[in-house]
Design a protein with these regions (language model features):
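Glycine/proline-rich active-site loop of Rossmann-fold NAD(P)-dependent oxidoreductases
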Residues: 7, 108-111
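Conserved N-box asparagine in the HATPase_c
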Residues: 1, 106
């Protein structure tokens, strides 16, 4: 309905780096991260690609896949996570703002179907 009634616009979906690769089991002391999480996040990335081809040229559809965001995790988890990230830390909550502003603006008028990973290099290993 959104696409039928609009001549231009931008949709930004959210996934996760776990939609791009498997979690590291040793990071989770209470057991492995459930497979359903990664499967659902991979589905969001595929949905983004599908919608980007079906809603173009008027509606752009992109996805942002953040890595770990620092927010009330215990210090041991933050340390384990940070050891696996080239930037040696978790993301701060405001570090997606510039990217989101870009993807929602006309400055990204030719960007569609992309999954942008913002993970401090996590998926570069």
């Amino acid at each position: 309905e959104f696409a039928k009634n609009n001549t231009k616009g931008s949709i930004v979906n959210f996934s996760s780096t776990y939609g791009c690769g498997s979690p590291i089991p040793s990071m989770y002391v209470d057991g492995e991260k459930h497979i359903g999480y990664g499967v659902s996040k991979a589905g969001v990335i595929q949905l983004t690609k599908h919608l980007s081809t079906h809603l173009a040229p008027n509606i752009r559809v992109n996805c942002v896949s953040p890595g770990g965001v620092r927010f009330e995790q215990d210090d041991d988890f933050v340390k384990r996570y940070s050891e696996h990230t080239p930037m040696k830390r978790m993301m701060n909550v405001n570090e997606l703002n510039g990217l989101l502003n870009f993807l929602c603006s006309e400055e990204s008028s030719y960007v569609t179907g992309e999954n942008v990973k913002v993970d401090g290099g996590w998926t570069s290993w």
